[in-house]
Amino acid sequence: MVVRPMMLRSSVAPGRQLLLSSARQRTASQWLSRAGASSRLSGQRFFADIKPPTTAAPTPATPSSESAVPPETVPKPSPAGQESTLPPSTPPTPAPKGGRFRRFLLYLLLTSGFAYGGGVFLALKFDNFHDFFTEYIPYGEESVLYFEERDFYRRFPNTLRNQNRLNPTPRDEGNKITIPSKSGLTSKVAEEEISGADVSQKGPHMSATPAQKSSEAQTKPAAAKPEDKTTAVVKAKEDKAAKEAEKKEEPRQPAIPAVTPLEFAQVNEGDEAIVQELVKTFNDMITVISADENSGKYSQPVAKAKEELQKVGEKIIAVREEARRAAQEEIQQAHATFDESARELIRRFDEMRAADAAQYREEFEAEREKLAHAYQEKIRTELQRAQEVAEQRLKNELVEQAIELNRKYLHEVKELVEREREGRLSKLNELTANVSELEKLTSGWREVIDSNLRTQQLQVAVDAVRSVVDRSAVPRPFVRELVAVKELAAEDPVVEAAISSINPAAYQRGIPSTSQIIERFRRVADEVRKASLLPEDAGIASHAASVVLSKVMFKKDAVAGSDDVESVLYRTESLLEEGNLDAAAREMNSLSGWAKILSKDWLVDVRRVLEVKQALEVIETEARLQCLRVE
């Protein structure tokens, strides 16, 4: 039910396009007719955005006449042609904000804009720079073309005024014939022209166009009958002479009214361009016939021609109605086709939905069977496990019973042995007492030997830790060696306290050796010397100056009792070379400010090394004390 309206709505759009395509094919292309327009603009087509109101076509006097456009129908100049050609003004510069980068970016944008505008101006003035600018500068060609078009519209503001006018189609009028003035005219017509004081009659005071049409209408009968040209001229001269004589001798006679002109043909239903053209041509013929004296004898043929013309208009209307009816039938047929397609689509959708429902049902049944099978397997497994537990419990009970039986058996055997000892082996107790004393002596010496062995092993483990700490090229963890020391200490509180005093990061990551401490101190000393030249609120310039001065600064000897950075560094380096890490760390700890902050990591490493060495010395001392206690 949702698809059908959408299908019907889509079927209406092609029907409208079919009806509008025939009207668009009859639309003529419109061209720019101004001589100043460029060749690029003259080759484009333009269509009217708004259809002008249709008015009754003026009846021309002759086929060669062209209808003049009244001044009120001339379209007003479009405001686009009168726009100012000045480029858009640059927006006012915002208030300067803090920050060098913002000012630099603002100046860069303004400079680029002025440079680009100057390039466009030079490209409009010089041809060589125009070629360079349009070829190598991005969007240069579009900018130059835009300003050229603006300049062209400024110089020719009426260029866009007549872009929707249709150029008159040239007509084949044949060879034009010029007839002398007053050729073939009678005295009656002359009198009518003389008596033209009536303002109700047509004349130059009403419109200049009908006079031109009448003059052109007079040329057509003369062109139609060239053999009567000479006779008409002679007759006109004789009539003129007789008229002058009558004026002198007799009084002026009243003018005879002119022949009543024939009515023009009108086809109200003929709104087609072809019908209007045919009516225009027929009216031209009526105008020519009306200009003749014997126009009365052509009234019946003209009336018959009007009827035929009306029939032609009716036939055209009938053909158009038939075409509209056929188009309506096609649209209805298309609607029916789309309705059938919509029903077919709905049917397919229902089939697909039913198929999907069946598939989902099958999948549901399959999934249900899988779940049931999984639950059955789970129940079977639980039962098997319960059975195994019961069997194991039974086995344990049997084992307990067997152990109890063995215990009873041993008790009975022991009682039997005691009885036997009381009888035959009375001296066995004395022998056992002697053996016990020997075992006590042996265990005492064994404890002494074990204590000495543990002390030696502890000393070896401490030496292994010291070798890892002092002889490794890179920091190496000594967790295994420290664990061995702790196991050999046999829960000695002194050794455990010494091991617990070591930082876990020291034996997990390792500690640097003395040479590494000295090498790192030299790198830290360089940075400390650089930082010693910086004030508290140092900026980028101060840091740069500190780096430069640290390169050229000379090292000085330590002065006794001096607390400056260079003296402290010199004393620390001397103590490190002597191997006195504790005193060196105390000297570096006396620094302050950035120097102390930069040497903080180095002090942490030195403290870790000192903690490990002190702990190892405590463990070695405890091992020696244990050896002395045993002795």
Curated annotation (Swiss-Prot):
Q: What coarse category fits the chief subcellular location reported for this protein?
A: mitochondrion
Coiled-coil region(s): 302-447
- Where does the UniProt annotation locate this protein? Mitochondrion inner membrane
The stretches that face the Mitochondrial matrix side, renumbered to this chain, are: 48-103
Region called Disordered, residue ranges: 50-97, 160-254
Key words of the record: Coiled coil, Membrane, Mitochondrion, Mitochondrion inner membrane, Transit peptide, Transmembrane, Transmembrane helix
Q: How does it assemble?
A: Component of the mitochondrial contact site and cristae organizing system (MICOS) complex.
Identify its protein family: Belongs to the MICOS complex subunit Mic60 family.
Name used for this protein in its record: MICOS complex subunit mic60
What is the scientific name of the source organism? Aspergillus niger (strain ATCC MYA-4892 / CBS 513.88 / FGSC A1513)
